[in-house]
Amino acid sequence: MSIKSDRWIRRMSEQHGMIEPFEAGQVKQANGERIVSYGTSSYGYDVRCSREFKVFTNINSTIVDPKHFDPGSFVDIVGDECIIPPNSFALARTVEYFRIPRDTLVVCLGKSTYARCGIIVNVTPLEPEWEGHVTLEFSNTTPLPARIYANEGVAQMLFFQAAADDVCETSYRDRGGKYQGQTGVTLPRT
């Protein structure tokens, strides 16, 4: 697999709707203010976080169980920023909707601006033929509250394309993946 450049990302997004909405360059300012950048970079695409957040709280003193997850463990927030409590986490989603080609795998890495503040972004790979808004997980590893900004860059997507003779036999769509077509912040499913 080879990593794909800005030219490929631009072409696939503009001609095939791989990323919507799509920003062909890097946006570093909004309303005259500096922001955490988003848009196309040399070998990736920096995604934005939407205004919907789910902040984890343990008010029910429950055990976190991915097979029996309690939606009541989250507080819903809609706003231009989200404060994550110390040593806690929040879920959000990308502004962008993705349609991944069959010969492509996407890996997500957090942006250094957040990582240098102790805020880690986690996303599993976007598999071939998956589509939807990406659910983002932000971990606040610090002993202090941490702020996440909506509509600004939070993570970078790297696109890897298989050789023509090595495209997967079964895509995410083929196997009926449980997160196919997700919109909004999606909680764990089994």
Curated annotation (Swiss-Prot):
User: According to the UniProt record, what class of enzyme is this?
Assistant: hydrolase
Matching CDD domains:
trimeric_dUTPase
Q: In which pathway does it act?
A: Pyrimidine metabolism; dUMP biosynthesis; dUMP from dCTP (dUTP route): step 1/2
**Catalysis: reaction(s):** dCTP + H2O + H(+) = dUTP + NH4(+)
Active-site feature positions = E137
Judging by the UniProt lineage, the source's domain of life is Bacteria
User: What GO MF annotations does this protein's record show?
Assistant: dCTP deaminase activity; nucleotide binding
Enzyme Commission number: 3.5.4.13
Entry keyword set: Hydrolase, Nucleotide metabolism, Nucleotide-binding
Q: Which InterPro entries match?
A: dCTP_deaminase (IPR011962), dUTPase-like_sf (IPR036157), dUTPase_trimeric (IPR033704)
Leader sequence segment: none
> Which positions in this protein are listed as binding dCTP?
K111, S112, T113, Y114, A115, R116, T135, L136, E137, Q156, Y172, Q182
Keyword Hydrolase in record: yes
Q: Which GO terms describe its biological process?
A: dUMP biosynthetic process; dUTP biosynthetic process; nucleobase-containing small molecule interconversion
Give the matching PANTHER family: DCTP DEAMINASE
Sequence similarity = Belongs to the dCTP deaminase family.
> What binding partners and quaternary form does the record give?
Homotrimer.
HAMAP family listed in its UniProt record: dCTP_deaminase (MF_00146)
Q: What does this protein do?
A: Catalyzes the deamination of dCTP to dUTP.
Protein name according to UniProt: dCTP deaminase
Organism of origin is Stenotrophomonas maltophilia (strain R551-3)
Q: Which gene encodes it?
A: dcd
